[in-house]
A protein has these predicted regions:
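NAD-dependent ADP-ribosyltransferases
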Residues: 1-183
Length: 183
């Protein structure tokens, strides 16, 4: 009996999600990213205070979870998808999931921004590894005309097109709710 090689392809895209700020909606923040052509780094949820861009290595089918209202505290269904190869060339790398005490022992202070806590021995375990997060120190310039905007609905897609007079500076706009048939 002969066996065939099976190649399981990893995802080709990384996704950065926007969220609402004090005065801007998640959609407004997405428009700002498209207008400026840059995802600005943030030190929110990052130890050591380093500003980073967070990206997620999610298969398209898993983007559906963004539509679940229970996830809205952490995610909103707005963002930018870019090619993983481009992000890698710009310096993005997968984070290191490990206990924080171990990171303090093993990593130089200037590298700890790469760590996301993995504390499985706790009574209530801390495990974010399902996010498959990547990080890039600083800001990330969008690849010219090759990013895809992610929005919740066709109404949001129309809003993107309206704000850019019919020509948003991206390869396309993907309405997640309609794509997945979620009411």
């Amino acid at each position: 009996m002969t066996t065939q090689r099976v190649k399981i392809s990893p995802t080709a895209m990384l996704t950065h999600f926007t969220r609402a700020g004090k005065t801007e909606s998640a959609l407004d923040n997405l428009v700002t990213i498209l207008r400026e052509g840059v995802i600005r780094g943030s030190n929110r949820m990052v130890r050591e205070g380093r500003a980073v861009v967070c990206l997620f290595d999610l298969p398209v089918r898993d983007l559906r979870t963004l539509l679940d209202r229970r996830n809205r505290r952490r995610y909103e269904p707005f963002g930018i998808a870019i090619e993983k190869r481009y992000a890698f060339q710009m310096g993005a790398r997968p984070v290191i999931y490990m206990p924080w005490r171990e990171a303090e022992r093993l990593l130089a202070p200037g590298e700890r921004w790469r760590v996301v806590a993995l504390e499985l021995e706790r009574d209530v375990p801390v495990d974010w590894s399902h996010e498959r997060e990547w990080r890039l120190a600083g800001d990330l310039a969008l690849p010219a005309g090759r990013a895809v905007a992610l929005v919740e609905s066709w109404r949001d897609a129309d809003e993107i097109y309206d704000r850019f007079q019919g020509q948003p500076p991206c390869a396309g706009v993907m309405p997640l709710r309609e794509m997945f048939g979620t009411p």
